[in-house]
């Protein structure tokens, strides 16, 4: 049984930069050098996007533009990954951009998609609130008509 565990453990990739055995998304993210300036800027960008998502909840048109912009950025992640893979030496210490796009998906696309999910949740909540208000208004009008008919 230990021989099979050793064989399975040897199949797990080891990160070349930190010599950490990559067994999960968490260990993958731990192997990243987060002190690089471009990663700090990316983190600041995601904090800004999240704050803008929360602050734009009351402004429907701004939120639509923000939503469409983030969806377009996620859509362009594959092209951005290819571009970054070709030019990583100009801005990074390590080559994080693999052909499958795992790094860019986790670090770039997932936070943007979480923001879009928040926006969609706000839209669904608004729709339900509007439908509830409309139904209450309809019931009040119906009751007022019935009361008006009874008094005549």
Curated annotation (Swiss-Prot):
One Gene Ontology cellular component: nuclear membrane
Keyword terms: Coiled coil, DNA-binding, Membrane, Nucleus, Transmembrane, Transmembrane helix
Residue intervals annotated with topology Perinuclear space: 1-36, 85-102
Family as reported in the entry's similarity comment: Belongs to the TMEM18 family.
Topology with respect to the bilayer: Multi-pass membrane protein
UniProt name for this protein: Transmembrane protein 18
Subcellular location(s) of the protein: Nucleus membrane
Membrane topology (Nuclear): 58-63, 124-152
Keyword Membrane (UniProt): yes
A biological process from GO: fat cell differentiation
Superkingdom to which the source organism belongs: Eukaryota
UniProt KW DNA-binding keyword: yes
Residue ranges crossing the lipid bilayer per the database entry: 37-57, 64-84, 103-123
């Amino acid at each position: 049984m230990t021989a099979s565990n050793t064989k399975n453990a040897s199949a797990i990739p080891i990160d070349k930069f930190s010599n950490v055995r990559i067994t999960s998304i968490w260990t993958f993210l731990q192997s990243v050098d987060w002190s690089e300036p471009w990663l700090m800027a990316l983190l600041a960008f995601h904090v800004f996007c999240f704050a803008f998502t929360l602050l734009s909840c009351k402004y429907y048109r701004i939120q639509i533009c923000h939503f469409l912009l983030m969806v377009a950025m996620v859509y362009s992640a594959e092209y951005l990954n290819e571009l970054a893979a070709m030019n990583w030496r100009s801005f990074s210490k390590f080559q994080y951009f693999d052909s499958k796009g795992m790094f860019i998906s986790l670090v770039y696309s997932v936070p943007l998609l979480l923001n879009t999910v928040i926006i969609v949740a706000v839209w669904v909540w608004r729709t339900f609130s509007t439908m509830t208000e409309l139904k209450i208004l309809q019931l009040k009008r119906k009751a007022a008509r019935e009361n008006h008919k009874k008094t005549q």
